[in-house]
Design a protein with these regions (language model features):
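C-terminal accessory region of radical SAM enzymes
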Residues: 1-5, 173-176, 182-188
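Non-transmembrane alpha-helical segments in soluble domains
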Residues: 79, 104-108, 161, 178-181, ...
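Catalytic cores of alpha/beta
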Residues: 197-211
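N-terminal pre-core extensions flanking Radical SAM catalytic domains
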Residues: 1-66, 82
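Core AdoMet radical
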Residues: 36-48, 59-73, 84-101, 113-132, ...
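Alpha-helical packing segments of well-folded alpha/beta enzyme cores
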Residues: 1, 41, 78, 85, ...
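Leucine-rich repeat
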Residues: 77-82, 107-114, 137-141, 180
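Distinct, well-ordered alpha-helical segments
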Residues: 101-108, 132-139, 202-206
Length: 212
Protein backbone atom coordinates (compact mmCIF):
# COMPACT_ATOMS: atom_id res chain seq x y z
CA UNK A 1 0.00 0.00 0.00
CA UNK A 2 3.01 2.26 0.35
CA UNK A 3 4.21 1.71 -3.23
CA UNK A 4 3.01 3.33 -6.44
CA UNK A 5 1.16 0.55 -8.35
CA UNK A 6 2.52 1.82 -11.66
CA UNK A 7 6.13 1.71 -10.53
CA UNK A 8 6.02 -1.42 -8.37
CA UNK A 9 5.35 -3.71 -11.31
CA UNK A 10 7.85 -3.82 -14.17
CA UNK A 11 6.66 -4.92 -17.61
CA UNK A 12 9.49 -7.34 -18.17
CA UNK A 13 10.33 -8.56 -14.69
CA UNK A 14 7.05 -8.52 -12.74
CA UNK A 15 6.72 -7.17 -9.23
CA UNK A 16 9.69 -5.27 -7.84
CA UNK A 17 11.04 -7.15 -4.82
CA UNK A 18 14.39 -5.54 -4.17
CA UNK A 19 16.00 -2.12 -3.88
CA UNK A 20 16.56 0.03 -6.96
CA UNK A 21 20.25 0.04 -7.81
CA UNK A 22 22.39 1.68 -10.46
CA UNK A 23 24.15 -0.45 -13.01
CA UNK A 24 27.82 0.12 -13.62
CA UNK A 25 28.88 1.81 -16.85
CA UNK A 26 30.24 -1.51 -18.07
CA UNK A 27 26.65 -2.72 -18.54
CA UNK A 28 25.91 -0.11 -21.19
CA UNK A 29 26.93 0.03 -24.82
CA UNK A 30 28.41 3.50 -24.91
CA UNK A 31 29.33 3.22 -28.59
CA UNK A 32 25.72 4.01 -29.60
CA UNK A 33 25.65 7.27 -27.66
CA UNK A 34 26.14 10.32 -29.87
CA UNK A 35 28.75 12.66 -28.34
CA UNK A 36 27.27 15.76 -30.00
CA UNK A 37 24.49 18.19 -29.13
CA UNK A 38 21.20 18.37 -31.12
CA UNK A 39 21.32 19.44 -34.76
CA UNK A 40 17.69 20.58 -34.86
CA UNK A 41 16.21 22.85 -32.20
CA UNK A 42 12.52 23.65 -31.90
CA UNK A 43 12.34 27.01 -30.15
CA UNK A 44 8.84 26.73 -28.75
CA UNK A 45 9.36 28.20 -25.30
CA UNK A 46 7.53 31.51 -25.78
CA UNK A 47 3.75 31.54 -26.29
CA UNK A 48 3.59 35.30 -26.91
CA UNK A 49 1.23 36.17 -29.76
CA UNK A 50 -0.93 39.13 -30.79
CA UNK A 51 -3.86 36.86 -31.75
CA UNK A 52 -6.24 34.79 -29.63
CA UNK A 53 -7.29 32.10 -32.08
CA UNK A 54 -9.94 29.67 -30.73
CA UNK A 55 -7.95 26.70 -32.04
CA UNK A 56 -4.97 27.69 -29.89
CA UNK A 57 -5.99 29.82 -26.89
CA UNK A 58 -8.90 31.66 -25.31
CA UNK A 59 -7.03 34.84 -24.41
CA UNK A 60 -4.05 36.91 -25.45
CA UNK A 61 -0.79 35.49 -24.13
CA UNK A 62 2.08 37.96 -23.77
CA UNK A 63 5.12 37.34 -21.59
CA UNK A 64 5.80 39.82 -18.81
CA UNK A 65 9.27 41.13 -17.93
CA UNK A 66 10.13 38.03 -15.90
CA UNK A 67 8.99 35.77 -18.71
CA UNK A 68 11.07 37.70 -21.23
CA UNK A 69 14.15 37.31 -19.01
CA UNK A 70 13.54 33.56 -18.77
CA UNK A 71 13.21 33.29 -22.55
CA UNK A 72 16.33 35.37 -23.16
CA UNK A 73 18.21 33.14 -20.70
CA UNK A 74 17.16 30.04 -22.64
CA UNK A 75 18.23 31.65 -25.91
CA UNK A 76 21.58 32.55 -24.34
CA UNK A 77 22.08 28.91 -23.33
CA UNK A 78 21.34 27.75 -26.87
CA UNK A 79 23.79 30.33 -28.20
CA UNK A 80 26.46 29.21 -25.76
CA UNK A 81 26.15 25.45 -25.55
CA UNK A 82 24.26 24.18 -28.61
CA UNK A 83 24.93 26.54 -31.51
CA UNK A 84 28.10 24.84 -32.89
CA UNK A 85 26.21 21.75 -34.08
CA UNK A 86 22.82 23.21 -34.96
CA UNK A 87 21.72 22.75 -38.57
CA UNK A 88 18.05 23.76 -38.27
CA UNK A 89 16.22 26.27 -36.08
CA UNK A 90 12.41 26.12 -35.93
CA UNK A 91 10.97 29.39 -34.61
CA UNK A 92 8.35 28.92 -33.21
CA UNK A 93 5.62 26.34 -32.65
CA UNK A 94 4.20 28.05 -29.59
CA UNK A 95 3.70 31.73 -30.41
CA UNK A 96 4.88 34.17 -33.06
CA UNK A 97 8.59 34.85 -33.73
CA UNK A 98 8.03 38.49 -34.68
CA UNK A 99 5.70 39.33 -31.79
CA UNK A 100 7.92 37.74 -29.15
CA UNK A 101 10.38 40.27 -27.73
CA UNK A 102 12.94 37.56 -27.00
CA UNK A 103 12.83 35.93 -30.42
CA UNK A 104 12.67 39.25 -32.24
CA UNK A 105 15.81 40.51 -30.50
CA UNK A 106 17.52 37.17 -31.10
CA UNK A 107 16.85 37.39 -34.83
CA UNK A 108 17.89 41.04 -35.05
CA UNK A 109 21.17 40.35 -33.26
CA UNK A 110 21.80 36.93 -34.77
CA UNK A 111 25.48 36.01 -34.94
CA UNK A 112 26.13 33.50 -37.77
CA UNK A 113 29.66 32.78 -36.55
CA UNK A 114 28.16 30.93 -33.58
CA UNK A 115 26.27 28.61 -35.95
CA UNK A 116 28.88 27.29 -38.40
CA UNK A 117 26.73 24.31 -39.46
CA UNK A 118 23.41 26.13 -39.75
CA UNK A 119 21.62 25.62 -43.07
CA UNK A 120 18.01 26.51 -42.32
CA UNK A 121 15.78 28.69 -40.17
CA UNK A 122 12.09 27.84 -40.36
CA UNK A 123 9.51 30.43 -39.31
CA UNK A 124 6.04 29.49 -38.06
CA UNK A 125 4.06 32.71 -37.91
CA UNK A 126 0.73 34.41 -38.47
CA UNK A 127 2.64 36.90 -40.67
CA UNK A 128 0.93 39.92 -39.10
CA UNK A 129 4.29 41.53 -38.28
CA UNK A 130 6.38 40.06 -41.10
CA UNK A 131 6.71 43.34 -42.95
CA UNK A 132 9.57 44.59 -45.10
CA UNK A 133 10.67 46.86 -42.25
CA UNK A 134 10.74 43.94 -39.82
CA UNK A 135 12.57 41.73 -42.33
CA UNK A 136 15.17 44.40 -43.05
CA UNK A 137 15.89 44.74 -39.31
CA UNK A 138 17.30 41.18 -39.15
CA UNK A 139 19.66 40.89 -42.16
CA UNK A 140 21.90 38.20 -40.68
CA UNK A 141 19.17 35.56 -40.83
CA UNK A 142 18.05 36.20 -44.41
CA UNK A 143 20.09 33.53 -46.16
CA UNK A 144 19.00 30.87 -43.67
CA UNK A 145 15.24 31.46 -43.87
CA UNK A 146 14.37 29.01 -46.62
CA UNK A 147 11.02 27.69 -45.37
CA UNK A 148 8.06 28.99 -43.41
CA UNK A 149 4.53 28.13 -42.33
CA UNK A 150 1.88 30.82 -42.13
CA UNK A 151 -1.27 30.10 -40.13
CA UNK A 152 -4.39 31.64 -41.70
CA UNK A 153 -7.47 29.48 -40.98
CA UNK A 154 -9.84 31.49 -43.18
CA UNK A 155 -10.75 32.30 -46.75
CA UNK A 156 -12.62 35.56 -46.15
CA UNK A 157 -12.18 38.78 -44.22
CA UNK A 158 -15.17 38.19 -41.93
CA UNK A 159 -14.08 34.74 -40.82
CA UNK A 160 -10.47 35.81 -40.39
CA UNK A 161 -11.16 38.91 -38.33
CA UNK A 162 -14.22 37.80 -36.35
CA UNK A 163 -14.03 34.02 -35.96
CA UNK A 164 -10.70 32.27 -36.40
CA UNK A 165 -7.92 34.87 -36.10
CA UNK A 166 -9.19 37.18 -33.40
CA UNK A 167 -7.05 40.29 -33.30
CA UNK A 168 -6.01 39.97 -36.92
CA UNK A 169 -6.52 42.32 -39.85
CA UNK A 170 -7.23 40.83 -43.28
CA UNK A 171 -5.65 43.68 -45.26
CA UNK A 172 -2.45 43.40 -43.20
CA UNK A 173 -2.31 39.66 -43.91
CA UNK A 174 -2.74 40.10 -47.66
CA UNK A 175 -0.17 42.90 -47.85
CA UNK A 176 2.37 40.88 -45.89
CA UNK A 177 1.74 37.74 -47.95
CA UNK A 178 2.47 39.77 -51.07
CA UNK A 179 5.74 40.95 -49.54
CA UNK A 180 6.75 37.48 -48.32
CA UNK A 181 6.24 36.16 -51.85
CA UNK A 182 9.12 38.40 -52.98
CA UNK A 183 11.68 36.96 -50.54
CA UNK A 184 14.08 35.08 -52.79
CA UNK A 185 15.60 32.79 -50.17
CA UNK A 186 12.27 31.10 -49.48
CA UNK A 187 12.18 27.73 -51.22
CA UNK A 188 8.68 26.88 -50.06
CA UNK A 189 5.90 28.57 -48.12
CA UNK A 190 3.26 26.50 -46.34
CA UNK A 191 -0.08 28.07 -45.43
CA UNK A 192 -2.14 26.24 -42.82
CA UNK A 193 -5.88 26.04 -42.29
CA UNK A 194 -7.18 24.46 -39.07
CA UNK A 195 -10.66 23.16 -39.96
CA UNK A 196 -13.34 24.36 -37.53
CA UNK A 197 -17.12 24.77 -37.41
CA UNK A 198 -16.66 28.43 -38.28
CA UNK A 199 -14.50 27.99 -41.39
CA UNK A 200 -14.95 24.57 -42.99
CA UNK A 201 -17.19 26.02 -45.71
CA UNK A 202 -14.25 28.19 -46.85
CA UNK A 203 -11.69 25.47 -47.54
CA UNK A 204 -12.06 25.80 -51.31
CA UNK A 205 -12.06 29.60 -51.09
CA UNK A 206 -8.86 29.45 -49.05
CA UNK A 207 -7.25 27.05 -51.53
CA UNK A 208 -8.11 29.29 -54.49
CA UNK A 209 -6.87 32.37 -52.64
CA UNK A 210 -3.49 30.78 -51.94
CA UNK A 211 -3.04 29.95 -55.62
CA UNK A 212 -4.33 33.26 -56.97
Amino acid sequence: KELCPYLSRLLKYGDATGPITLKSNSNYNTSIVEPTTPTRILMNFDRTCNYKCPSCRVDLIVEDSNGIKRIEKTIEEIDTYYSPNVKTLYITGSGDPFVSVGFRNYLRNFNPTKYPKLTRIHFHTNASMWTKKMWDSMPNVHKYVTTCEISIDAGTRDTYENKTRLGGKWDTLINNLNFISTIKTLQWVKTSFVVQDSNYMEMETFYNLMYS
